[in-house]
Amino acid sequence: QAETPTYHLDQELRSFANYANFKPTIGSVTDEARMRQIFSTYRPELVLHAAAYKHVPLMEHYPEESIHTNVLGTKNMADLSAFYQVEKFVFVSTDKAVNPTNVMGATKRAAEMYVQSFNEYLETNHTKFHTKFITTRFGNVLGSNGSVVPLFKKQLANGGPLTVTHPDITRYFMTIPEACQLVLEAGIMGNGGEVYVFDMGSPVKIVDLAKRMIELSGKKVGEDIEIQFTGLREGEKLYEELLNDH
């Protein structure tokens, strides 16, 4: 549904002569009729489902939209994948789905539960071929749209300050290539029902990341560029977890 990122991806892929056999298609996962048309036309063997609303504070104000896209949109894609006998369905989830404290995390957890339950139902009730549903959980992807690094870069370019919500807030990070690798490996290795979590090492304090970026820009923390603490936003955790308590 995001037209501009789709356009940029189209342009990037067209620069690779050996990878010209693709067709960008605009549509929303919440539009079941449109998605059915796409499945019927292209008959995919693999579905990588990454469509979601992801910004925690924004979704606190629009829970109905988060449910519509993150839960019902995922249900549409999962149901159609099973109907059109897709071989594997990889659902891209988030560490915010673990013991969720906000709307976005709760909707992603609900979507995880649907995908896993659907896989179990198909395994139990269909002895012949059925779609295998696999889940991957991401931390924060460095450099992705709306992530903290591009924000800090913009704030640095404007002379600061760099805004951090809390001095103790930490996050897990992974790079874009690592995120892509996790999704592709899950699609290859998964046999249905698994939840794959990438080893992202130790969590990073956001204030330390801010200090490091200031130093890398050749500036001094507190002299040239200030760090400003703005307070935790609605639904925001001090730290994220990778695995559920249960």
Could you describe each region identified by the protein language model?
Residues 189-246:
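Mid/C-terminal beta-alpha module of Rossmann-like enzyme folds, strongest
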Residues 103-107, 141, 175-176:
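The catalytic Tyr-centered alpha-helix of NAD(P)H-dependent dehydrogenases
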Residues 30, 72, 139, 170:
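Adenine-nucleotide cofactor-binding loop residues
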Residues 128, 151-174, 178, 182-206, ...:
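A conserved pocket-lining segment of Rossmann-fold NAD(P)-dependent short-chain dehydrogenase/reductase
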Residues 53-113, 117, 123:
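Conserved Rossmann-fold NAD(P)-dependent oxidoreductase catalytic core, especially the SDR/UDP-sugar
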